[in-house]
Amino acid sequence: MNCKINRNAAKVLKKMLSTEEAEGKMIRVYITHMHGDHAHYDMKLDTPAEYDEIVKTDKDIDILLDSREEFLDGVWIKYFYVPEEGFEITNLSKEPHGHHHH
């Protein structure tokens, strides 16, 4: 499976991973809900479970993805500082309409 993160996201995720509560845990991207042809995603700290694939990114951060969820394959984790701070997780390989902000 595939996952990409931009530089800002890597910085923020590294900070999250260096906290005490993150000890021994990894970043998981998961689907909050599906709408037919696209999904909404979120992230949390978690430990690998039976069906997970640990996906290496080019930013030295490993991301947990449930290998049974085809919509998780190819997710893009981005972090923006403007117009407001926050993560945007999209999957362009699965979304027919290009991307949209929520």
Predicted regions and their residues:
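Long, hydrophobic N-terminal alpha-helical segment
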Residues: 1-23
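A broad, low-specificity signal marking well-ordered, structured residues that form hydrophobic/aromatic
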Residues: 3, 27, 87
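Generic, low-specificity signal for short hydrophobic/alpha-helical stretches with a mild N-terminal bias
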Residues: 9-13, 25-27, 59, 71
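Short, structured protein-protein interaction patches enriched in aromatics and acidic/basic residues
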Residues: 22-53, 57-64
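Histidine-centered metal-binding segments
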Residues: 35-36, 94-102
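C-terminal structural segments of small proteins and small subunits
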Residues: 71-98
